[in-house]
Amino acid sequence: MTANVDGVPGKFATLGLTYDDVLLLPGPSDMAPDEIDTASYVSKNVRVNIPLLSAAMDKVTESRMAIAMARQGGVGVLHRNLSIEDQANQVDLVKRSESGMVTDPITIHPDATLGEADALCAKFRISGVPVTDGNKKLLGIVTNRDMAFETDRSRQVREVMTPMPLVTGKVGISGPDAMELLRRHKIEKLPLVDDDGVLKGLITVKDFVKAEKYPNAAKDGEGRLLVGAAVGVAGDAFERAQALIEAGVDFIVVDTAHGHSRLVGDMVAKIKSNSSGVDVIGGNVATRDGAKALVDAGCDGIKVGVGPGSICTTRVVAGVGVPQVTAIYEAALAAKEAGVPVIGDGGLQYSGDIAKALVAGADTVMLGSLLAGCEESPGELMFINGKQFKSYRGMGSLGAMQTRGDRKSFSKDRYFQEGVASDEQLVPEGIEGQVPYRGPLSSVVHQLVGGLRQSMFYVGGRTVPELQANGRFVRITSAGLKESHPHDIQMTVEAPNYSRQ
């Protein structure tokens, strides 16, 4: 940013603007809102159908939220306040939730017990498991129907499974042909085998049903839902990244409160040099120089935002930050030159703020408080005075950084406090609270994307790049902000996409 205000050089940077300081100017439009394409890029190689990410926070994104986000066309970023094993398992759950073909299906040995088969089905939320020998040769299949009336859970799978020969398909079978086999034989699972009878994949009828139900889902090249995951810069960060990549994650986010740090650049470079095919995103930054440093480190995406979140206190505890519209604009100036997408992280209150972030230079936005109240978020549901709320907290809050019994916090190094000896010495940069319960994610996303489509229609942008090119801001006063909200009326019924904050 230029160190100049009203022609006076010195320590003062440019004027900082945030979402409430600006509006978008309407422009000529030749399309209807339903003709608009909201697809965009999270990173150089990860494309989503709606420009929304759920935040890597322990009250926002675990596997259930990530699955729901990808089905709506966005993507979830799994938080890292988990053990390495747990976070990798979360990635696996998302990847196995649906696919065109399961290339590495869960299997069970014929000598396993029915109790073990039950536990496996419960863990992965599946209704049946192929039975294979030690060489992965298909021996049969065991399903819920096979086990339903078996009271002795110590019996072996081989005693109740449906043995070969089964209806199977060859590797490379087309979708329509697979669907025809499932329909003709009235089965739910179609194992795919090679000429030697070795199991190579699995197609289920549920995947076809889900594909029809969620036509806008964001998927990888194998038809699996997209998912990202966060890592830090200290301790087990590199080991964690390797485990996540092995589990099938689509991108890694090196997630810290201060991305303009040598430690972040070093970790990005280390992950990039030791893995291929997985994009690495760095953050968070709020300046042009910070974004350029991450570009130089090899980032495939840049996350922008220092202190804009509703639960963040960095700007008052540390006195550091940049209002979010200006932060995105400045970071994008460095990122766009290198073809690196920008993620606007935090500070969004309404659907209109999404469009403002995109016009400022973001390619996608990351949402925390707007999604924390959803049914799929991992926050605790509570009732207060007859109303429903869900717990929400910053990853820099005491609750997120403290050790609870045997549960270790993996969040401290996000704020570079991993070396703090005791919880009493932590310096929090966030708070804990609750947000109103908002129902299923699908309803919330419908309103957010609907608002974005209206913004693109008003501005005159058929695609996100067109919105970015055509969008222009007008700065407003406090009176202009007051005029922008409903006024001179007592609101009796809240709209699903508006409440006075």
Q: Residue locations for each model-derived region?
A:
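Alpha/beta catalytic cores of nucleotide-metabolism and tRNA/nucleoside-modifying enzymes
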Residues: 1-28, 108-109, 170, 177-180, ...
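Active-site-adjacent beta->alpha loops and helix N-cap segments on the catalytic face
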Residues: 34, 84-92, 150-154, 174, ...
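Bateman/CBS regulatory modules and CBS-like beta-alpha motifs in cytosolic regions of diverse proteins
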Residues: 34-48, 55-57, 86-126, 131-133, ...
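Short beta-strand/loop segments at the ligand-binding rim of alpha/beta enzyme cores
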Residues: 47-54, 100-105, 164, 220-230, ...
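Catalytic cores of alpha/beta
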Residues: 64-67, 239-244, 286-304, 344, ...
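Catalytic beta/alpha-barrel core
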Residues: 77-81, 107-108, 128-130, 168-170, ...
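Terminal amphipathic helices with adjacent charged low-complexity linkers/tails
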Residues: 80-95, 131, 135-151, 182, ...
